[in-house]
Curated annotation (Swiss-Prot):
One of its GO terms (molecular function) is cytokine activity. InterPro entries: Cys_knot_C, Cystine-knot_cytokine, DAN, Norrie_dis. Keywords: Disulfide bond, Secreted, Signal, Wnt signaling pathway. Residues 1-24 form the signal peptide. Coiled coil: none annotated. This is Norrin. Transmembrane segments: none annotated. Residues 39-132 form the CTCK domain.
Length: 133
């Protein structure tokens, strides 16, 4: 009898491991690190110029968050005992978004000796978080 309980426990743990439903940080981080499409920061270069004034443009290194989140998106119907369903579904989804960023500025030289300052957020890290509706 004891062997059957042990075998059943081992089978359940194996099933949970296959489904990815474990609490092990090491296992889940390994799964995330091995996914090349995971949510992460990507660098790119873009030209910054003023939309109205004649200023010399500058090439700037920027970063964006891009990739997939491991959590599944889901929508379920809500059951109500009212004839009016204000919100007929409960939805949950996760998006790849900036986690930390810093404010940066650059100066553009414009005609007539004028200088304009452009500001932007430079993304330092990305993570998955619940999407807002």
């Amino acid at each position: 009898m004891r062997n059957h309980v042990l075998a059943a426990s081992f089978s359940m743990l194996s099933l949970l491991a296959l489904m990815g439903d474990t609490d092990s940080k090491t296992e889940s981080s390994f799964m995330m690190d091995s996914d090349p499409q995971r949510c992460m920061r990507h660098h790119y270069v873009d030209s910054i110029s003023h939309p109205l004034y004649k200023c010399s443009s500058k090439m700037v290194l920027l970063a964006r968050c891009e990739g997939h989140c491991s959590q599944a998106s889901r929508s379920e119907p809500l059951v109500s005992f009212s004839t009016v369903l204000k919100q007929p579904f409960r939805s949950s989804c996760h998006c790849c978004r900036p986690q930390t960023s810093k404010l940066k500025a650059l100066r553009l030289r414009c005609s007539g000796g004028m200088r304009l300052t452009a500001t932007y957020r430079y993304i330092l890290s990305c993570h998955c978080e619940e999407c807002s509706s």
